[in-house]
Amino acid sequence: MATENKNLSEYDKNTIPNAKDFRFGIVVSEWNDVITEGLYNGAFEALIDCDVPAQQIIRWNVPGSFELIYGAKKMLQTQNVDAVIVIGCVIQGETKHFDFVCEGVTQGIKDLNVQTDIPVIFCVLTDNNMQQSIDRSGGVHGNKGTEAAIAAIKMAYIRQQASISHPFNQPLLSSGALQIEETPIKIEKE
């Protein structure tokens, strides 16, 4: 396996946009809380490390991963955030419940990203066993919460830049298409 015993959550602060003025929401599932607390801690610590003041990070808890969708929707509607991170953990069991929850949560978060103008970052572990989740929530593979926080900063920055250089302010090409000037954004390649 290419990721075996490799921490995938390291980041270079110099490649991340300034985040001190952004406001983030984090919606955390209480189910499998040993894992979701580790993911939350990774996300929170990464946001703080990237100069987001603690008072600009809002945390809401929901009972399970399926409820992340509603929690994120309400946070988007009421909290004036620049991005939301949803944190959950679904571990394979003996029934199809795992498939239904994973599919529903994935589609629900995708729908929020399509329907709203605020990025929602998916940090829901869908592992085969508890050890895989431990390894990805602060264990040998790093912390997916950390990775989600960095993604949230980058997406909040993209949203900010897109509103500054709105495409309707750009000239039309002779073909009638909008000419959009690209704003360089440093994003690490994985």
Swiss-Prot record:
Pathway: Cofactor biosynthesis; riboflavin biosynthesis; riboflavin from 2-hydroxy-3-oxobutyl phosphate and 5-amino-6-(D-ribitylamino)uracil: step 1/2
GO molecular function: 6,7-dimethyl-8-ribityllumazine synthase activity
Membrane-crossing residue ranges in chain numbering: none
Chain positions recorded as (2S)-2-hydroxy-3-oxobutyl phosphate binding sites: E94, T95, R136
Residues given in the record as 5-amino-6-(D-ribitylamino)uracil binding sites: W31, S65, F66, E67, C89, V90, I91, F122
Enzyme Commission number, as recorded: 2.5.1.78
Record bears the keyword Transferase: yes
Pfam families xref list: DMRL_synthase
Catalytic activity: (2S)-2-hydroxy-3-oxobutyl phosphate + 5-amino-6-(D-ribitylamino)uracil = 6,7-dimethyl-8-(1-D-ribityl)lumazine + phosphate + 2 H2O + H(+)
Active site (record annotation): H97
UniProt GO cellular component terms: cytosol; riboflavin synthase complex
Family listed: Belongs to the DMRL synthase family.
Name of the protein in its database record: 6,7-dimethyl-8-ribityllumazine synthase
Organism whose genome encodes this protein: Flavobacterium johnsoniae (strain ATCC 17061 / DSM 2064 / JCM 8514 / BCRC 14874 / CCUG 350202 / NBRC 14942 / NCIMB 11054 / UW101) (Cytophaga johnsonae)
Lineage: Bacteria, Pseudomonadati, Bacteroidota, Flavobacteriia, Flavobacteriales
